[in-house]
Structures are given as structure tokens and as C-alpha cells.
A protein has these predicted regions:
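Short, ordered loop/turn segments at secondary-structure junctions
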Residues: 10-13, 38-44, 115-116, 146-149, ...
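Short glycine/serine/threonine-rich phosphate/pyrophosphate-binding segments
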Residues: 14-24, 45-46, 119-127, 138, ...
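Glycine-rich oxoanion-binding loops at beta->alpha junctions
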Residues: 52-141, 181-192
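C-terminal non-catalytic interaction/assembly regions of soluble proteins
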Residues: 285, 289-367
Length: 367
């Protein structure tokens, strides 16, 4: 019996998403399932235009053909699947093997993403979400994302809808799995950029503070530090004082270290700093934008030590890199495993990598 699968990506992009989508579609095609791409995460299932879609088959195909002709007429000869879909004023469309054939090594997510929370306090749109899933006749949703995306998946599953999760976050800190898509590639980006910063720091006998992502976990910065030459790593799990950091820095100078690299996670809380992020307005999941801790730290240390100290924020560079071989392989395993669960009629699970094996855990474990 054929099944209709909707695929979406939520939250921040990460290396490995496009390959995972490709392998979901490829495996689903092999077993005779229909696959549909949902644009911009959960937002794509809340779009008002969905109610105008009467047929996910021939009706949609006609609209996409017209959209392609319009783009070509406007001399836009190179366009992605999402461009085609958006131009047709759609938020969901068929996703075939040919559509995703070149997605295997591409960075980001060609489906688009957002931080939309259908269950947001004060703006609960879960009823619309469920109605649209039913209108579209989607038997399963495969949601690729981190804690927020999996939380929505869990709540949707709890309401009786079939959801399979695939873990993604470059922070590498999602519960229920030993690996999340994008982590290894992001560590490689840290290594490459720290090596570049190291050359300049050495040339000018200066200290450089390199800020990485890592809201609640320092795993990314920690692994990045182990892959390259840094003098100090600061992570959210420990809140140092400026005085402690200054003491270590000065001690290294006394030991003959002429320059230094300090790696700091964005979520690190320096005890001397007021938590300026707490009063800021957050996204639909309540996440606020952090102050630039690396920049603040560099400025304060320069005043305290009378040394030349610079700062670099790697920020979104960590998300946007081409996936490395490891992330492509894991994307393959995760994507195939998701469809295999669907074949067995299993739902409410997240694909997991644990003890060296691909397995799955309840979505409740990922939140």
C-alpha cells in the first residue's frame, strides 16, 4: 500500500540536511511511496494557500509547469526546487528522485526552514496544522531538526499524527542520540578558521578570541579545541570570572607564550557580565539572541591586560559549509532508517545513533 510522506526541515540549517532529504526520497521511491517537500519547516503546513490545493497529483504538477515557464520567460534559467514552488504560490509540492538528484553534497536545506512553533503560547495553531495534514492526505511527516522541531513532532504525534524525527544540530547536544547531522562538518570549519586566525595572531603576537555556536552545550567548542591549537576554551557548562580568564592568560605569557587563541561558546556566561539576553524578545520557542560574548570578552581583556586582543565570530559560517563525508554518510543512514520505520508502520520515534549503531528512540527522549 502506497504512503504519502511530507518532509520538512526546522530551525537553523546544518550540513547534511540536503543529503538526508535526498536519501529519504530515494528510499521512499524504491518502495513505492510518494514524497512531498514542505517549505520553511512547520510554517509550510500553516500556509493559508494549502486550502486551495485540491489535488497533490496532477493539479500541482500543472501549477509547477506553469511556474517553470514563468521563470524561464523572465530569463531565470537556473532555479532550485524551492524557487519553482514559491513562484507557484505553494508551500508543498512533489519531491522526486530527479528533483533531489544533485542535493547529495549541497549545504543548507533546499526546502527552506523557519523557527515556527505551531504550539506557541498565545498563538496556538495546532488545529490548523492537523487540519492541513489531513487535507493533504499526508500519512507521515519526517521532520529534520533539533530540540524545537522534535518537540513539535512529539506533540503532533501525541495528537495522533504519524511523525518520524531525524536529529540535526551543529551543537551536537540533542538528547537521545550520540550524533546529530552537521556536527562533524562544523568542527572542521572551526579547525580551518582557527588555523587561519592562528597565523595572524602569531604574526602580531596578539590574542584572538574566536566565538563559536553552542547555546547550552560546549561540545562543539570543546571538540573544535581538540582538533586544533588553542590556549583556552570557554563553555556554557562552566561560568568563569574575568579575573580567572585574565590570570590564565597572563600565566601563559609568563611561560613564554607569545600569542594565544581563546575559543568560546556563544552561550558561555562570564560571571562578571549581566545577563543582557534575558530581557530580549525571543523567537516562537522562547530563544533569545545572545550578546556577542567573544567581542565583549576581547574588549574587556584588552583593558585588563594591556595586550592587543581581537575577536572573530564564526556564527553562521558553521552552519553553511558543504557537508563532509561523515555527515553525508550519516545523512544516508538516517534517511534510509526513517523510511524503514514508515514501512513497518512505526511512528513517534526519532532516528538515533547510539553505541555505534543506527537505531531509534521515542520522540519524547529528544526534548
Amino acid at each position: 500500500m502506497t504512503k504519502r510522506i511530507g518532509i520538512l526541515t526546522g530551525g537553523g540549517d546544518a550540513p547534511g540536511l540536503n543529503p538526508a532529504i535526498k536519501y529519504i526520497v530515494k528510499k521512499a521511491s524504491q518502495v513505492g511511496y510518494e514524497t512531498f517537500g514542505i517549505t520553511d519547516g512547520w510554517k509550510g503546513l500553516l500556509e493559508p494557500g494549502i486550502e486551495k490545493i485540491t489535488d497533490l497529483g496532477s493539479d500541482l504538477q500543472k501549477r509547477l509547469e506553469v511556474s517553470a515557464m514563468e521563470l524561464i520567460k523572465n530569463r531565470i534559467h537556473e532555479f532550485e526546487w524551492k524557487d519553482l514552488v514559491k513562484n507557484a504560490r505553494l508551500s508543498i509540492a512533489p519531491l522526486s528522485k530527479s528533483d533531489v538528484s544533485k542535493w547529495g553534497k549541497k549545504p543548507g536545506t533546499n526546502l527552506g526552514s523557519s523557527r515556527t512553533n505551531p504550539f506557541a503560547k498565545g498563538n496556538d495553531r495546532s488545529k490548523i496544522l492537523i487540519e492541513n495534514i489531513e487535507k493533504l492526505g499526508l500519512d507521515y511527516i519526517v521532520a529534520l531538526g533539533g530540540e524545537d522541531t522534535q518537540t513539535v513532532g512529539y506533540r503532533l504525534s501525541d495528537l495522533g499524527k504519524n511523525v518520524i524525527g531525524i536529529p540535526k544540530t551543529i551543537d551536537g547536544d540533542l538528547p537521545g542520540t550520540d550524533y546529530t547531522l552537521g556536527f562533524r562538518t562544523a568542527v572542521g570549519v572551526i579547525k580551518k578558521n582557527v588555523e587561519i586566525a592562528d597565523g595572524t595572531a602569531r604574526s602580531h603576537n596578539q590574542t584572538t578570541v574566536v566565538e563559536t555556536m553552542g547555546r547550552h552545550s560546549g561540545l562543539l567548542a570543546y571538540e573544535g579545541a581538540h582538533s586544533t591549537n588553542v590556549g583556552m576554551v570557554l563553555i556554557p557548562e562552566y561560568s568563569p570570572s574575568l579575573e580567572e580568564i585574565k590570570t590564565i592568560l597572563m600565566r601563559r605569557k609568563e611561560q613564554g607564550v607569545s600569542y594565544d587563541i581563546i575559543l568560546v561558546s556563544e552561550g558561555t556566561k562570564i560571571r562578571d557580565y549581566e545577563d543582557r539576553s534575558s530581557a530580549a524578545k525571543g523567537d516562537e520557542f522562547g530563544h533569545v539572541k545572545f550578546d556577542h560574548v567573544g567581542q565583549l570578552l576581547a574588549s574587556d581583556l584588552e583593558d585588563l591586560t594591556d595586550q592587543k586582543i581581537r575577536s572573530i565570530s564564526l556564527g553562521h559560517l558553521l552552519r553553511g559549509a558543504d557537508p563532509n563525508g561523515y555527515d553525508i554518510d550519516m545523512a544516508n543512514h538516517f534517511g534510509v532508517a526513517a523510511v524503514e520505520l514508515i514501512e513497518k508502520g512505526i511512528s513517534g520515534r526519532m532516528i538515533s545513533y547510539s553505541d555505534g549503531k543506527i537505531t531509534h528512540v521515542p520522540l519524547s527522549r529528544a526534548i
